Curated annotation (Swiss-Prot):
This is 5'-nucleotidase SurE. Keywords: Cytoplasm, Hydrolase, Metal-binding, Nucleotide-binding. PANTHER family: 5'-NUCLEOTIDASE SURE, 5'_3'-NUCLEOTIDASE SURE. Its EC number is 3.1.3.5. It catalyses: a ribonucleoside 5'-phosphate + H2O = a ribonucleoside + phosphate. GO terms for molecular function: 3'-nucleotidase activity; 5'-nucleotidase activity; exopolyphosphatase activity; metal ion binding; nucleotide binding. It comes from Bordetella parapertussis (strain 12822 / ATCC BAA-587 / NCTC 13253). Gene3D superfamilies: Survival protein SurE-like phosphatase/nucleotidase. A divalent metal cation binds at residues 8-9, 39, 91. Binds 1 divalent metal cation per subunit. Nucleotidase that shows phosphatase activity on nucleoside 5'-monophosphates.
């Protein structure tokens, strides 16, 4: 079993170290992670400059690029053999609902998914790493389950773990993505040099945290497991858009 491990918080992040330690013994682990924090990088690739690859003293490989860069470079240029699984995390904070569109953690797993490799993203829903060992224990259980009984391809799982002791977790729940309210307004401020700058505001609160969602499950103390897909086609609108676009198509 060959497992590629990445994240978006950087190769020095406690969440990555805890995940690698938890997965030890399950297979041959290769760690390729960003040199610096790339939270919110989504699926971006670096196309305007070359990437450098270095190895840390603990054997972790780090890249001066995004999470997607890391997995892409690993799969197409670093690893001698294709991995059986790609895992990402453990993220410092939740990746639920709309977060998944922006998440570098989910993006690293998505890159593996795009290459046809089963992929899992792990996030601890509160920042600060308070119960990171418990989160890593839960992550290992999910990976063990995938190894023991692999899901049929394609596989992209988004796993959010409550910030509590493992003994206080209430099991696992298969969920759908919830939804957040729009983000808070940007924060405008002025630098000491008189330049106006803007900070992106905090994420919005949960708008859909009803039973069955990732928000609801984690609030109940459950580990949320959400299967994702990357087909962005709105299939239910295809016929409506065909009718709407008919005059355009005729005149084309």
């Amino acid at each position: 079993m060959r497992i590629l491990v990445s994240n978006d918080d950087g190769y020095n992040a406690p969440g990555l170290e805890a995940l690698v330690e938890a997965l030890s013994g399950l297979g041959e682990l290769t760690v390729v992670a960003p040199e610096t924090n790339h939270s919110g990088a989504s699926n971006s690739l670096t196309l305007n400059r070359p990437l450098t690859v270095r190895t840390a003293s603990n054997g972790f490989i780090y890249v001066n690029g995004t999470p997607s860069d890391c997995v892409h470079v690993a799969l197409t240029g670093l690893m001698d053999a294709r991995p059986d699984l790609v895992v990402s995390g453990i993220n410092n904070g939740a990746n639920m609902g709309d977060d998944t569109l922006y998440s570098g953690t989910v993006a690293a797993a998505s890159e593996g998914y795009l290459f046809g490799i089963p992929s899992i993203a792990f996030s601890l829903i509160e920042k600060g790493w308070q119960h990171i060992e418990s989160a890593a224990r839960a992550a290992r259980q999910v990976v063990e389950r995938q190894i023991a009984q692999p899901l049929a391809a394609p596989v992209l799982l988004n796993v959010n773990i409550p910030n509590r002791r493992y003994e206080d977790m209430k099991g696992y729940a298969v969920t759908r993505l919830g939804k957040r309210h729009p983000s808070e307004p940007v924060v405008r401020t002025t630098t000491p040099y008189g330049d106006t700058v803007y900070w992106i505001g905090p994420v919005g609160l949960a708008a859909d945290a009803t039973p069955g969602t990732d928000f609801h499950a984690t609030a109940q103390g459950q580990v949320s497991v959400t299967p994702l897909r990357l087909d962005l086609t709105q299939h239910s609108q295809l016929d409506d858009v065909r009718n709407w676009a008919e005059p355009l198509c005729v005149n084309a």
